[in-house]
Amino acid sequence: MMSISPIVSLRRCDNEPSMPDEWRLYKLASRLRTFSNWPFTEDCACTPERMAEAGFVHCPTDNSPDVVKCFFCLKELEGWQPEDDPMDEHKKHSPSCLFIALKKKAEELTLSEFLKLDLEHTKIKMQKQMNLHIERFQAKANEVRGHLEKLDADETQ
């Protein structure tokens, strides 16, 4: 399986209480709604229900119709086969995900438990954003270094 970075589109239901989209994803039904065009639906291990239970949301791209991302640890996976078990794949590719380590449903968490869990989720998001900015900065620094080295080489000739 390969990791890529799609955007998740979350449809809202009229009967859901007002809350941030990210909090809505703690609910199984909200994650399940993202699988409307999932390529595996019957006679397979990776049904939409099992994918959502494992914490995944479906975020397809034109080139990758089977891309999913854990709403919590942000691990992105694609290249699913009908026999792939979503929970096993999640544990294999992101063993430290706190969502899959929960011993109860997210809806059963106390407010304190939920807020602690969401704090960890926020840290994960911030780390991912920071890593992205660092990668962009390093790429730009390498580009500038190349230009400077070329200028230096031109001057010494």
UniProtKB/Swiss-Prot annotation:
Q: Respond yes or no to whether keyword Ribonucleoprotein is given for this record.
A: no
Q: Which residues bind Zn(2+)?
A: C70, C73, H90, C97
Organ and tissue specificity = Highly expressed in vascular endothelial cells of tadpoles.
Q: Which SMART domains does the UniProt entry name for this protein?
A: BIR
* Residues where Phosphothreonine is found: T47
- Keyword field: Cell cycle, Cell division, Centromere, Chromosome, Chromosome partition, Cytoplasm, Cytoskeleton, Metal-binding, Mitosis, Nucleus, Phosphoprotein, Ubl conjugation, Zinc
Q: Which InterPro entries match?
A: Baculoviral_IAP (IPR051190), BIR_rpt (IPR001370)
Listed GO cellular component terms?
Answer: chromosome passenger complex; cytoplasm; kinetochore; midbody; nucleus; spindle midzone
A Pfam family of the record is BIR
Description of post-translational modifications: Ubiquitination is required for centrosome-targeting.
Q: Where are the BIR repeats?
A: 31-101
Principal location class: cytoplasm
Family to which the UniProt record says this protein belongs: Belongs to the IAP family.
Domains: what does the record tell us? The BIR2 domain is required for vascular development.
What role does it play? Component of the chromosomal passenger complex (CPC), a complex that acts as a key regulator of mitosis. The CPC complex has essential functions at the centromere in ensuring correct chromosome alignment and segregation and is required for chromatin-induced microtubule stabilization and spindle assembly. Does not appear to exhibit anti-apoptotic activity. Plays a role in increasing blood vessel size during development.
Matching entries from PANTHER family are given as: BACULOVIRAL IAP REPEAT-CONTAINING PROTEIN 5, DETERIN
* Protein name, per record: Baculoviral IAP repeat-containing protein 5.2-A
UniProt lineage: Eukaryota, Metazoa, Chordata, Craniata, Vertebrata
Its gene name is: birc5.2-a
